[in-house]
Amino acid sequence: MSDEYQSVKQELKALLADRKELEDKLDKLQQEIYDKESEYFDVDGGSKSYHNILRGFDGMSRTQSNNSNMTNNDRIFSLSSASYVKQVQDQ
């Protein structure tokens, strides 16, 4: 095999390794965003109410708690990533 072929082959291996590393970093970042969203919407943590920037704060001063559960549609940051949505659908 020629030296040029070996050089291109090594370059391709390096690029594929870089791609894998970037994909892993992206997966970790997307999981971190998902976790932060979950933490933000955590109804059991601290306040028992479900008032936030997405649902609004109407009725926040009422003594009764709002028992609405978070839906996947509330995950505007996680769902904004096409690769994350595809990853979830593939599972």
UniProtKB/Swiss-Prot annotation:
Oligomer status and interactors: Component of the NuA4 histone acetyltransferase complex.
Keyword annotations from UniProtKB, A to Z: Chromatin regulator, Coiled coil, DNA damage, DNA repair, Nucleus, Transcription, Transcription regulation
Cell compartments where the protein resides: Nucleus
Domain of life: Eukaryota
Family classification: Belongs to the EAF6 family.
TM stretches of this protein: none
UniProt function note: Component of the NuA4 histone acetyltransferase complex which is involved in transcriptional activation of selected genes principally by acetylation of nucleosomal histone H4 and H2A. The NuA4 complex is also involved in DNA repair.
InterPro entries: Eaf6 (IPR015418)
Protein's organism: Candida glabrata (strain ATCC 2001 / BCRC 20586 / JCM 3761 / NBRC 0622 / NRRL Y-65 / CBS 138) (Yeast)
Signal peptide positions on this chain: none
Keyword Nucleus: yes
Identification of the protein by name: Chromatin modification-related protein EAF6
Coiled coil: 1-43
GO process terms (BP): chromatin organization; DNA repair
